[in-house]
Amino acid sequence: MTDPITIKITILQPVHKVWDYFYNPKHIVKWNFPTTNWHCPKAESDFQEGGRFNYRLEYKDKSFGYNFSGYIDEIEVLKYVKSHLDDGRKVEVHFNKIDDNTTEIIEIFEPEIQNSREMQRVGWYAILDRFHKYVEKH
């Protein structure tokens, strides 16, 4: 990876639940957006090595949106997923079981060049924090 950004969060739920909520499209549409003026109207995933994922993120007023999509390169069940986005950037998500009811997620991603590193770190963390709140409430 080239000059990656790393973010992490601790979630008070067991690793198997965190894993399922993170990769199951029926849950992804509920949390995969940075702020309340965004939403994720569509999430598709062929969750296997070589499988494709495609998540649509949009402003609720439909004034702007984009697809977050790519391919899954490697899966170690309940441990990590390595993938690459359509623009070639690499993403890794690690799931560390702290105890039976606590899981740490670490996301490592290559930044794109259009936005500052800090803006990307804040945006990705906002989505990860929304995930954290969602999985702890459901």
Positions of PLM-derived features:
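Hydrophobic pocket/interface hotspot
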Residues: 18-19, 28, 53-55, 72, ...
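Hydrophobic ligand-binding cavity/cleft-lining segments
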Residues: 1-39
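Residue-level recognition of well-ordered beta-strand positions that form the cores
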Residues: 8-10, 56, 71-73, 84, ...
